Amino acid sequence: MCNRLVTVTGVAMVVAAGLSACGQAQTVPRKAARLTIDGVTHTTRPATCSQEHSYRTIDIRNHDSTVQAVVLLSGDRVIPQWVKIRNVDGFNGSFWHGGVGNARADRARNTYTVAGSAYGISSKKPNTVVSTDFNILAEC
């Protein structure tokens, strides 16, 4: 009787350990972000995303280039607040809601798209303010 109890207890422990190992959360790596600036598409490392209150920040860093976008989450709507583009193909520029440039944003599950035009300076025309189209696709 004592041997059966030890055997049943041992089997129960093995089954419990197996089930708990299967029940642990699996993390799936995020996809690479895609940036299109002035018609040229770049695939970068996955975006770093954070959220404070209703504002989601999407931060994409790749070598010497940086793109940051902040969107306001309001119910099902995603409203772009600002985008800063630094040193992407020699372009440095910004979009600001109610200010310079224009943008629209969309969210499909956990993938954000922010697209529009930014004003700034390009190394191609360093003495002229230019408007450049951008498209950001990032998973958060």
Curated annotation (Swiss-Prot):
GO CC term, one of those recorded: peptidoglycan-based cell wall
Residues making up the signal peptide according to the UniProt record: 1-21
Segments traversing the membrane: none
Lipid-carrying residues in chain (N-palmitoyl cysteine): C22
Keywords in alphabetical order: Cell membrane, Lipoprotein, Membrane, Palmitate, Signal
A Pfam family assignment: Myco_19_kDa
Membrane topology: Lipid-anchor
Domain of life: Bacteria
Lipidated residues (S-diacylglycerol cysteine): C22
Subcellular location field: Cell membrane
Family stated for the protein in its record: Belongs to the mycobacterial 19 kDa antigen family.
Name of the protein: Probable lipoprotein LppE
Organism name: Mycobacterium tuberculosis (strain ATCC 25618 / H37Rv)
